[in-house]
C-alpha cells in the first residue's frame, strides 16, 4: 500500500474532519482520480510520434493510455475528424496513490526553475489542474530514449466541495504551493 494512502487514512482524515467540523469521516474530501493528458498534435504528420508518446505515458502512469481523436475537422490545423491527436490515462485506486507519491516526492522537485505550484489552478470545486512542461522529470523516463521533450496536463479530481477544502487536502499531502 502506498505511504500517502496510509497517511491519508491515519492522520489526514482526522485533521480535516477537525478543521472543517465534519460530523462524519465520509464527509472528508478525498482524491477520486488523477487524469494525465498529453496532446500530440504532431501525430497528424508522423504516426511514430504517437507511438513514442504512448510509450512515455505508459511508463509514467503504469497503465496503457487511451488514444484521443479529433472530434471535428479543422482545416487550419490540418486535422480531420477521427485523427489521433493525443493520449490520456485515468488513474484510480492503488496506482493513483503510487503516482501521487512519485509526483510529490520525486517529479515536482525535479522541475527546472521551480518556485512552487500556483494555488490559483483550482477550478472552484476543489479539483486541481497543473501542467508539466517536460516528461523527463519522471524517473521512469530514460533521457536517452526519448525522441522529443513533451509536456502533459495532470488533473487531480477530489470530492471537495470548494477550493479551500481541496487546498487543505493537497496541503496535507505536502504539495509545494506558492506562499
Curated annotation (Swiss-Prot):
<comment type="function">
    <text>This is one of the proteins that bind and probably mediate the attachment of the 5S RNA into the large ribosomal subunit, where it forms part of the central protuberance. In the 70S ribosome it contacts protein S13 of the 30S subunit (bridge B1b), connecting the 2 subunits; this bridge is implicated in subunit movement. Contacts the P site tRNA; the 5S rRNA and some of its associated proteins might help stabilize positioning of ribosome-bound tRNAs.</text>
</comment>
<comment type="similarity">
    <text>Belongs to the universal ribosomal protein uL5 family.</text>
</comment>
<protein>
    <recommendedName>
        <fullName>Large ribosomal subunit protein uL5</fullName>
    </recommendedName>
</protein>
<dbReference type="InterPro" id="IPR020930">
    <property type="entry name" value="Ribosomal_uL5_bac-type"/>
</dbReference>
<dbReference type="GO" id="GO:0003735">
    <property type="term" value="F:structural constituent of ribosome"/>
</dbReference>
<keyword id="KW-0687">Ribonucleoprotein</keyword>
<dbReference type="InterPro" id="IPR031310">
    <property type="entry name" value="Ribosomal_uL5_N"/>
</dbReference>
<keyword id="KW-0689">Ribosomal protein</keyword>
<keyword id="KW-0699">rRNA-binding</keyword>
<dbReference type="InterPro" id="IPR002132">
    <property type="entry name" value="Ribosomal_uL5"/>
</dbReference>
<dbReference type="GO" id="GO:0005840">
    <property type="term" value="C:ribosome"/>
</dbReference>
<dbReference type="GO" id="GO:0000049">
    <property type="term" value="F:tRNA binding"/>
</dbReference>
<keyword id="KW-0820">tRNA-binding</keyword>
<dbReference type="Pfam" id="PF00673">
    <property type="entry name" value="Ribosomal_L5_C"/>
</dbReference>
<dbReference type="GO" id="GO:0019843">
    <property type="term" value="F:rRNA binding"/>
</dbReference>
<dbReference type="GO" id="GO:1990904">
    <property type="term" value="C:ribonucleoprotein complex"/>
</dbReference>
<dbReference type="Pfam" id="PF00281">
    <property type="entry name" value="Ribosomal_L5"/>
</dbReference>
<keyword id="KW-0694">RNA-binding</keyword>
<dbReference type="InterPro" id="IPR020929">
    <property type="entry name" value="Ribosomal_uL5_CS"/>
</dbReference>
<comment type="subunit">
    <text>Part of the 50S ribosomal subunit; part of the 5S rRNA/L5/L18/L25 subcomplex. Contacts the 5S rRNA and the P site tRNA. Forms a bridge to the 30S subunit in the 70S ribosome.</text>
</comment>
<dbReference type="InterPro" id="IPR031309">
    <property type="entry name" value="Ribosomal_uL5_C"/>
</dbReference>
<dbReference type="InterPro" id="IPR022803">
    <property type="entry name" value="Ribosomal_uL5_dom_sf"/>
</dbReference>
<dbReference type="GO" id="GO:0006412">
    <property type="term" value="P:translation"/>
</dbReference>
Amino acid at each position: 500500500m502506498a505511504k500517502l494512502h496510509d497517511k491519508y487514512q491515519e492522520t489526514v482524515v482526522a485533521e480535516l474532519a477537525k478543521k472543517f467540523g465534519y460530523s462524519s469521516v465520509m464527509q472528508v474530501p478525498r482524491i477520486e482520480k488523477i487524469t494525465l493528458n498529453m496532446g500530440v498534435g504532431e501525430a497528424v504528420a508522423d504516426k511514430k510520434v504517437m507511438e513514442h508518446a504512448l510509450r512515455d505515458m505508459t511508463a509514467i502512469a503504469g497503465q496503457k493510455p487511451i488514444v484521443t481523436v479529433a472530434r471535428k475537422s479543422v482545416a487550419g490545423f490540418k486535422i480531420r475528424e477521427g485523427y489521433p491527436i493525443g493520449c490520456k490515462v485515468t488513474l484510480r485506486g492503488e496506482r493513483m496513490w503510487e503516482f501521487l507519491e512519485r509526483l510529490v516526492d520525486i517529479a515536482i522537485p525535479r522541475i527546472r526553475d521551480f518556485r512552487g505550484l500556483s494555488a490559483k489552478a483550482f477550478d472552484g470545486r476543489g479539483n486541481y489542474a497543473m501542467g508539466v512542461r517536460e516528461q523527463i522529470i519522471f524517473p521512469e523516463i530514460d533521457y536517452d530514449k526519448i525522441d522529443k521533450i513533451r509536456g502533459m496536463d495532470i488533473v487531480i479530481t477530489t470530492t471537495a466541495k470548494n477550493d479551500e477544502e481541496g487546498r487543505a487536502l493537497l496541503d496535507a499531502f505536502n504539495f509545494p504551493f506558492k506562499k
